[in-house]
Amino acid sequence: MTKFIFVTGGVVSGLGKGITSASIGLLMKARGYKTTNIKIDPYINYDAGTMNPYQHGEVFVLDDGGEVDLDLGNYERFLDTNLTFEHNITTGKVYSTVIEKERRGEYLGATVQVIPHITDEIKRRIREIAKDYDIVVVEIGGTVGDIESMPFLEAARQMQLEEGRENVAFVHVTYVPKLKVVGEQKTKPTQHSVKELRSLGIQPDAIVARSEDPLEEEARKKISLFTNVPREAVVSAYDVEDTYEVPLLLEREGLGKYLIKRLKLEDREPDLREWEKMVAKYKALKETVEIAIVGKYVKLTDSYLSIKEALKHASVSNDVKVKIRWIEAEDIEEHGTKLLEGVDGIIVPGGFGARGAEGKIMTIKYARENDIPFLGICFGFQLTVVEFARNVLGMKGAHSTEIDPQTPYPVVDLMPEQRNLEKLGGTMRLGAYPVKIKKGTLAYRLYKKELVYERHRHRWEVNPDYIEAFEKAGLVFSGVAGDDERRMEILELPDKRYFIATQFHPEFKSRPMRPAPVFHGLVRAAKEYKQEKNATN
């Protein structure tokens, strides 16, 4: 019988419920149990696709084309698995289904209500995924007490009643602040948060107490007493240097063992050796390289979370720590490329719209002319084509029709199948598509195979009418779409140290033990470039 672990959050948002949920999933998987993670987002949006990265962070793209919350990226990285769009349950999806059923007459004239109809649909979606797994970790987004979360918490309460207490556990993530004035950790916010949860009929089985420093014994005892949670199940999750340390911290605190016992499962020795090795290696890195990320959402770095993580993975594989220099593309427009001086590598990531586009083009020109290791992603790939057209081929005013519909040289154009769409949500070229790689190229040396599947999220593409002109001028298109060879996927400049751009998002498939090849290559090239600079100085 499938076991369920619900993870809720209290006091404030942004405590790291996603990392806690991913860590619990890893601890269960490390014990040999078939485990998956589900994220519940209580917003009314159907998916994360049309959300502003400033508000919500990055939109993570799955193999099946699902545009989902960034927490699913953490789940995939921690559990080394590929999830589906169904693993992200939103209020929008739930209500859509219920309203469709009502319109079809499936409720036989009943008054459709939150209980039972909405809660039944939530439970149905969770159970549908659970069929194939021993353990399902379900993170309920938001904070206990939010009006949006109520139906989901009620559905979770009902599931414990229906599945049996030994099959459903609740983990509550809270915040324990330390007031500088008195110098002690305060448990009152946690007490109130649990009180709120209990008023909804849910008694947490374990409490993950987030704090700056390790939880003091006095605070632990107090939380246990006032929340009716055993002392061994009050877990100290203090701030660590890197999120990949969290599973090891929770395991040391005994959370994995406690949940296994609570769910009446056989406790097995967790195999975390590879994970421990990876964390130790990352922490021990001394040598550094600095890589600039020039984007339009850099004020909220979570907008580029998967890129940050992919650089971390490539740090471990190259024995060098990456320091990121965050640069707003508009600042390049205003202050020039001097903001890039001294960097060992440059990334121009994805993004939509005109704001900052010229700054990104200036950045690409700087990388190309100064032979600095460079990686362009999605919009960064398209703007690399624009920069090359303008500054190498002399096509004055060349642009993407996304930015300038009247450009004399539309070197990047809307894909034909995108031309008559009325809806924005879920209509891009989304998800994993095959990419054919040409032998004898940088891309082939990185991937070491001729066919790869990478995740996409775009409407525009390189205009096939200009490909011949680009290739004559020395630009190599080393990867094309497996389903349409006129669709360009990877470009490179062979005469440069490392200059590559991809139409797809390689960061979405990067994993701690298997870094994305183009990121591994970028960090390696940045390391070699820095060594060269140091040798000549």
Swiss-Prot record:
Q: What is its EC number?
A: 6.3.4.2
Q: Where is this region: Amidoligase domain?
A: 1-265
- Active site positions, chain numbering: 378 (nucleophile), 505, 507
Q: Where are its TM segments located?
A: none
Q: How is its activity regulated?
A: Allosterically activated by GTP, when glutamine is the substrate; GTP has no effect on the reaction when ammonia is the substrate. The allosteric effector GTP functions by stabilizing the protein conformation that binds the tetrahedral intermediate(s) formed during glutamine hydrolysis. Inhibited by the product CTP, via allosteric rather than competitive inhibition.
Residues at which UTP binds: 13, 186-191, 222
Residues holding Mg(2+)? 71, 139
What keywords would UniProt list here? ATP-binding, Glutamine amidotransferase, Ligase, Magnesium, Metal-binding, Nucleotide-binding, Pyrimidine biosynthesis
Classification via InterPro entries: Class_I_gatase-like, CTP_synthase, CTP_synthase_N, GATASE, GATase1_CTP_Synthase, P-loop_NTPase
The residues covered by the Glutamine amidotransferase type-1 domain are 290-532
Q: Which residues bind ATP?
A: 14-19, 71
**What are this entry's molecular-function GO terms?**
ATP binding; CTP synthase activity; glutaminase activity; identical protein binding; metal ion binding
Q: Which residues bind CTP?
A: 13, 146-148, 186-191, 222
According to its UniProt record, in which pathway does this protein act? Answer: Pyrimidine metabolism; CTP biosynthesis via de novo pathway; CTP from UDP: step 2/2
Q: Quick one: a GO biological-process term for this protein?
A: pyrimidine nucleobase biosynthetic process
Q: Which reaction does it catalyse?
A: UTP + L-glutamine + ATP + H2O = CTP + L-glutamate + ADP + phosphate + 2 H(+); L-glutamine + H2O = L-glutamate + NH4(+); UTP + NH4(+) + ATP = CTP + ADP + phosphate + 2 H(+)
Residues the record lists as binding L-glutamine? 54, 351, 379-382, 402, 459
- Assembly and binders: Homotetramer.
Protein's job: Catalyzes the ATP-dependent amination of UTP to CTP with either L-glutamine or ammonia as the source of nitrogen. Regulates intracellular CTP levels through interactions with the four ribonucleotide triphosphates.
Q: What else is known?
A: CTPSs have evolved a hybrid strategy for distinguishing between UTP and CTP. The overlapping regions of the product feedback inhibitory and substrate sites recognize a common feature in both compounds, the triphosphate moiety. To differentiate isosteric substrate and product pyrimidine rings, an additional pocket far from the expected kinase/ligase catalytic site, specifically recognizes the cytosine and ribose portions of the product inhibitor.
Family named by the database record: Belongs to the CTP synthase family.
Name it.
CTP synthase
